[in-house]
Amino acid sequence: MLIAAGIVVVALAAVGAALGVALSGGSSKANLPARGSLVDALPGAPDVQRELEGIPQRGNVLGSPSAPVTLVEYVDLQCPYCRQFETEALPELLTRYVRPGKLEVEARIVAFIGPDSERGRAAAIAAARQSKLFNFTQLLYFNQGVENTGWLDDDMVTSAAASIPGLDVPRLLSDRSSATTDEQASAFDSQANADGVTETPTILVGKSGATPRQVTLASPDDVQSVAAAIQAALG
């Protein structure tokens, strides 16, 4: 059973207005590094680095820009089922389809569950401006806490940013509260509304440039159904 948006009673249209969360608040982490590295990194950071190394990223898209098939994923950073998909299914899809240039993955991050989702989304969008969105989100999934317990606070955001080699940490923290970040968050919500997204993860697959179709997942780590949709799109 996947997480339904209605359970959380967060209307997509109201998400942008609900940014009362302190997205731009300073972190209490001492000795903030200028650049991220694997020194004193969060658990899972080396694994994420190996998993994504060499795969091109641009904004919220992972994979070759000439890939013939696109997978669109709607995810919430607090969603435990999204964590299953991202840490169990996605790595296999990266190996089979993304690295060979057959598939690109477009992440559209929603915030159905609560304030931590909002805070994490803003930071992920800021990471996307440095082409590190997938590094950031994968690392958060590796270190995911219990929903709405405050686990995704400024310290977690800062620690995650500091665990991504090469990422400009102060820039990410500053970019979280920019107008560009707010606009992208609103765009994700509008896209989710248009695609009728009511639960996470929601996965759509189709030929690049065409309208993708939703894939019904038997379980959050259902690689087989997603792979079948990719193969069909590849022809």
Segments from the language model and where they lie:
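Structural alpha/beta surface segment adjacent to cysteine/selenocysteine redox centers
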Residues: 67, 75-78, 83-162
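Short N-terminal micro-motifs specific to bacterial/archaeal maturation
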Residues: 49, 62, 127, 148, ...
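C-terminal cap of thioredoxin/glutaredoxin-like
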Residues: 1-32, 162-235
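A generic helix-loop boundary/linker signal
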Residues: 61, 113-114, 126, 151, ...
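Conserved short-loop catalytic and cofactor-binding motifs
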Residues: 59, 111, 124, 145, ...
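Extracytoplasmic thiol/disulfide redox context detector
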Residues: 1-112, 189, 228-235
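Glycine-centered flexibility sites
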Residues: 63, 101, 131, 192, ...
